[in-house]
Amino acid sequence: MKSLTCFKAYDIRGKLGEELNEDIAWRIGRAYGEFLKPKTIVLGGDVRLTSEALKLALAKGLQDAGVDVLDIGMSGTEEIYFATFHLGVDGGIEVTASHNPMDYNGMKLVREGARPISGDTGLRDVQRLAEANDFPPVDETKRGRYQQINLRDAYVDHLFGYINVKNLTPLKLVINSGNGAAGPVVDAIEARFKALGAPVELIKVHNTPDGNFPNGIPNPLLPECRDDTRNAVIKHGADMGIAFDGDFDRCFLFDEKGQFIEGYYIVGLLAEAFLEKNPGAKIIHDPRLSWNTVDVVTAAGGTPVMSKTGHAFIKERMRKEDAIYGGEMSAHHYFRDFAYCDSGMIPWLLVAELVCLKGKTLGEMVRDRMAAFPASGEINSKLAQPVEAINRVEQHFSREALAVDRTDGISMTFADWRFNLRSSNTEPVVRLNVESRGDVKLMEKKTKALLKLLSE
């Protein structure tokens, strides 16, 4: 029995050909069907050149297991989340490799209610069955049906439920879909704005879906992927810039000067907006950078709740706490009314409405927060011995630390600064985040000291 290396901690991702191909996709479909025994599931795929073929092989595996398949076509991951909870079906699978290189593809799996299927919640079971490849013969009388459906209008209806279009004043927005799956959704949102008479002008960059990614793999978390959005904001004198990754489950924002705004400060902005409408609500955040979020949420009368990093952990904690909103500094934003799932479309609509309601630019809204809690942003270091390096840092700072937290990696808090250090699940990399209380130089000094310690 050959092991399938495309099964990762939270999803499926692999190099095309050997790690992931149509035969393996069929086996994954068959295994999902045998393990969960769903009646109906939804399928979708991103713009990658292999997504359609892998999706159809997956569908055949599911049908062979007796599962009815509803195919929503080219879509972002959150459209599968939406379809799963909106239709009340038993699960969903999106074929996507998000921002991975061209020669990769993958899958994100959910069960009923758009709950994630990850390592300890069924993914290992699906892997075991797919690897064994020992399925009962196909019963043609019980073979599942296949149907193509279109839910785009219902999805856009849902998105517009988060804002009041009457609050929108004249806005010019640059939106960079990166030739990914976001383009058609942006078109549908633009058409809806026009139909409702909203004074919003969208300047669309790289809006045509193209699995060849002629303008590079869309991953605005990387500074080298931000120039086209920044330049368009400056050229057109736009109020804000928005950029997506390939399956648009993350959304990245740029202010009116084309400056990239770290996702950390957007979490505070959205938390405050939700608490204005829902006083006393719980807000979930990750441990990497937290002081700004805790400060904003507490001041607004909400309850901040820290969760381990990663979508499966955040979603589980949101359900447990019945939190209205959750945010990670990595530009993942989660919403209770979106079945506790993450969306890349809801955040920019909310921020656009906030710009109009507050009568302030995005830059003005986050400037004070950025000054109050300056942050390093996540710095990755490739190390031969990551565990030893983390232990070295902990020993060095243990005497002066006021608090130590191990929710995710290690967080150490001092009077005027704090840091979080965690190792990657998938590679020999440690990820460092540092923040201070209103002191950029202190933050920079401590960041340098930590990086030096790590590399010794």
From Swiss-Prot:
Any single biological process term in GO: GDP-mannose biosynthetic process
UniProt-listed CDD domains: PMM_PGM
Residues that coordinate or bind Mg(2+): 98, 245, 247, 249
Gene Ontology molecular function, alphabetical: magnesium ion binding; phosphomannomutase activity
Active site: 98
Keyword Hydrolase: no
Associated pathway: Nucleotide-sugar biosynthesis; GDP-alpha-D-mannose biosynthesis; alpha-D-mannose 1-phosphate from D-fructose 6-phosphate: step 2/2; Bacterial outer membrane biogenesis; LPS O-antigen biosynthesis
Co-factor: note: Binds 1 Mg(2+) ion per subunit.
Cofactors demanded by this protein: Mg(2+)
Enzyme Commission code(s) on record: 5.4.2.8
Catalytic activity: alpha-D-mannose 1-phosphate = D-mannose 6-phosphate
InterPro entries given in the database record: A-D-PHexomutase_a/b/a-I, A-D-PHexomutase_a/b/a-I/II/III, A-D-PHexomutase_a/b/a-II, A-D-PHexomutase_a/b/a-III, A-D-PHexomutase_C, A-D-PHexomutase_C_sf, A-D-PHexomutase_CS, Alpha-D-phosphohexomutase_SF
Pfam families: PGM_PMM_I (PF02878), PGM_PMM_II (PF02879), PGM_PMM_III (PF02880), PGM_PMM_IV (PF00408)
Keywords: Isomerase, Lipopolysaccharide biosynthesis, Magnesium, Metal-binding, Phosphoprotein
PROSITE patterns noted in UniProt: PGM_PMM
Family: Belongs to the phosphohexose mutase family.
Function: Involved in GDP-mannose biosynthesis which serves as the activated sugar nucleotide precursor for mannose residues in cell surface polysaccharides. This enzyme participates in synthesis of the LPS O antigen.
Full protein name: Phosphomannomutase
Gene that this sequence comes from: manB
